[in-house]
Structure formats: structure tokens, C-alpha cells
């Protein structure tokens, strides 16, 4: 009974989550005040970074004890120099789960005109910033590509011990990759999936 009692104690305060998550990230989808409109602000990752040259939102890895909101605002300030006081977060879009064990929490926020004017990108992280009108995404469908995730087991998997044949029909997976072209920029992948989800709400 001691083992069961210990298990009960552990579950008294347990909050269910998604099994297999190893890393959590948060990004801010920033809508900025520009001449009476509210286009979406994007950044291009600096040279030398992983995935350099890709279009993305400000954001990054959630630190221990940090909420998605705290992470998104911190990263936005670090990457773009926008003070947290100039960002009003008004919602959170559906989180994205990656096949390699990560969760991405996208938050939607409005950046004031003062915050937009204060932008000073970190040269170590951001090559450039640009905006895209919301109506572009509302009126333009992305190109959509799909790639397959095929299971590949090691040759020493114990098929006989678990009672299955070697041609067992393991489940694979599919990943949707939307791609938008805007002027000289390509918005694709995870960032495009976030945008697509927001536009479909």
C-alpha cells in the first residue's frame, strides 16, 4: 500500500498535460498600429542562426517557471526592442505540437504606435522586419504541401516477443506545409500554419 499511497500523493496536484512534450516555445503574433491599419509584423532570422533567413514571429524557448505570455513578451523585447508595456495581448491561438516533442504557444497581441516606433532589432537575432496587411492573408490562399512521416523501427525490435509480424502496419503521419509569397518574402512552415489557423477562426 505504501507505493499506492505515494502515487496518490503525486497525483493530488498533478495537472494533465500532453505526453511526450520535451520543450515548450511561445511566440507573439504582433499586430501593429500603422496609419489606421493593423498589419502583422514579421522578422527574418539573422545570419548564423539555426534556420537563418527564415521568416518568423518574435519568440523562443520558455524558461523554467515561465508562462507562455511572459516568454512571448520577453522575447519580443529582446529581439525587437518593443517594451512590454506597449504590447496588449488579446488572445492565444491553438498551440502547435511538433513531431519531435515540442509545443508552440502562439499569442496574439497589439503593438502600439509608440511600440512600433521603438523597434530596434537585435543584430544577433534579426536580419530585418517587415509587415503584411491582414487582408493579404484573408484574400490569398497559401500553396499547401504535405510531407509524409514514415515509421522506421530498428532491425532488432522484438516482433516475436510482442506478438506481431514484421510487416505490421505501423501508423505514419502527415505534416501540412503552407507557403505564402509576399513581395520578396516567403512565409512558410510553422509560422504560416499559425497564420492559417488565425485566419480560419
Annotate each predicted stretch with a short phrase.
Residues 142:
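Active-site phosphate/ATP/adenylate-binding loop shared across adenylate-forming ligases
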Residues 132-138:
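An acidic-aromatic pocket/loop used at catalytic or ligand-binding sites
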Residues 126-131:
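Flexible glycine-rich active-site/ligand-binding loops centered on an Asp-His dyad
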Amino acid at each position: 500500500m505504501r507505493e499506492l499511497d505515494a502515487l496518490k500523493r503525486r497525483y493530488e496536484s498533478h495537472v494533465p498535460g500532453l505526453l511526450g512534450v520535451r520543450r515548450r516555445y511561445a511566440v507573439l503574433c504582433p499586430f501593429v498600429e500603422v496609419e489606421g491599419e493593423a498589419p502583422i509584423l514579421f522578422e527574418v532570422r539573422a545570419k548564423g542562426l539555426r534556420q537563418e533567413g527564415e521568416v518568423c514571429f518574435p519568440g523562443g524557448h520558455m524558461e523554467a517557471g515561465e508562462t507562455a505570455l511572459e516568454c512571448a513578451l520577453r522575447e519580443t523585447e529582446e529581439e525587437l526592442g518593443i517594451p512590454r508595456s506597449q504590447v496588449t495581448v488579446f488572445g492565444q491561438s491553438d498551440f502547435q505540437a511538433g513531431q519531435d516533442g515540442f509545443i508552440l504557444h502562439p499569442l496574439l497581441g497589439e503593438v502600439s504606435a509608440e511600440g512600433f516606433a521603438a523597434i530596434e532589432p537585435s543584430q544577433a537575432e534579426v536580419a530585418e522586419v517587415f509587415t503584411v496587411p491582414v487582408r493579404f492573408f484573408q484574400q490569398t490562399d497559401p500553396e499547401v504541401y504535405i510531407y509524409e512521416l514514415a515509421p522506421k523501427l530498428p532491425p532488432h525490435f522484438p516482433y516475436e516477443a510482442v506478438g506481431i509480424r514484421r510487416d505490421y502496419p505501423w501508423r505514419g503521419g502527415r505534416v501540412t506545409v503552407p507557403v505564402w509569397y509576399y513581395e520578396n518574402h516567403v512565409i512558410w512552415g510553422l509560422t504560416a500554419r499559425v497564420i492559417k489557423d488565425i485566419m480560419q477562426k
